[in-house]
Every structure is written in C-alpha cells, then in structure tokens.
Amino acid sequence: LVDIIAALEPTFGGINLEDIKAPECFYVEKKLRERCNIPVFHDDQHGTAIITAAAVLNGLRLIKKDIAEVTLVCSGAGAAAIACLDLLVALGMKRENITVCDSKGVIYQTREDRERMDESKVRYAIADNGQRVLGDAVTGKDIFLGLSGANVLKPEMLQTMAENPMVFALANPQPEIWPPEAKAVRPDVIIGTGRSDFPNQVNNVSVSYTHLRAHETSLH
C-alpha cells in the first residue's frame, strides 16, 4: 500500500488517507511522510482530532474550566481516539487526567493483555486504581469523549459526571448517547455528536481539505 500511494506523489499536491484501521494507519502514514515531499494526512485521525480539540477548547471556555485541570474519559482506543488524545495533551491536558477504555474495559498498566497492546494504547495506560469498566471510569469526569459504539454511555453513567459535563458522542450513525437522552438527565451538559441533525456537530467533514493550503507551485 505504501509503495502504491508513494508512486502517485508526482501527480498530486497532497494525499489524504481514508479508512485505514489502527495500528496499520500509523505505519502507513509514517512511512509515506518519510518518502513523500507532499503533505500526507490521515483524515480519520487528524481531521477528527482537530475538530474535537476545537470543540473541547470552546466548551471549556463556556464553562470556565482549565484544560490543565479537567479530567477526561475516552471510550474507544482506535486511531481517531488516540489522535484526539495526543492533540489534547499537546494543548495542555495532563496525560494523568485521562482514562481510556477499549472493548475490554479500562486500559491500565498491569492489565493481563498489556504485552499485546499497541504502543499507542500503552501510552495511555493508567496506574491500577481498581477501575475496570467505563461505568467506573466516567464517575467524576469533566469530559466524555466517545469514539466507540452506539449507546455505551448510559444515562445513569452521565449522572455521575462532574458539574457542567461535556459529552462528545462521536460514533456514527448512532452516538454513544443521544442528545435528548443526555439533556433529560443532565440539563447542564454540553453535548456534541458527529451528526448534522443535532446542534454542535463535531465531525471531521468540517475540517477535511481546508487544512491543506498551497504555499508554492511549479505550475505556470
């Protein structure tokens, strides 16, 4: 795949990678960036990360919370989730304030399958604090970031979150929790989804291709 895409370099000014699963997407993007002299961008990772970071920063401004102090739980540990977390950390969120859950539950340092985890997951493994499932991890958190599956955030879980919680339920087509359901149990929630039929859409379609700008060209 890397060889095929690299062979297209003379024809295009930039390449967007789409729908490559983790961990293969990390390898493909890295190798192409090493070989190509044009921008190579994996939209599922970085497009999602850019729009999610914008949503988080705007939400924090509204509720007057500091990115360095808030806590976050992430449901999902694929390419998009890891890219979002990496960008949020780069913007000032403390890694120790982040808890990540995959399909097996909370990712912690002594979990029995740690040796088989992708490096990207291991980076976000927390010290064992007894939390094992999403329902444990979400308690008291300021932010829920969902890049996993439909209806995984139950109303009773949302009720345990901190004051003025932010929920980004980005699974498509069905989010981790529906906005009306979230508002019913937590009127103080700020909620965004990946869908265009609800307010506060958080979707990489808002970023796609606007991040690529030509600085110079050899065409005349």
Language-model-detected regions and their locations in the chain:
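Short glycine/serine/threonine-rich phosphate/pyrophosphate-binding segments
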Residues: 25, 48-53, 79-86, 151-156, ...
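Rossmann-fold NAD(P)-binding glycine/threonine-rich loop
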Residues: 171-202
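Active-site nucleophile and cofactor-binding loops and adjacent substrate-binding regions
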Residues: 41-50, 73-77, 196-198
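Rossmann-like NAD(P)-binding element
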Residues: 112-158, 162-170, 176
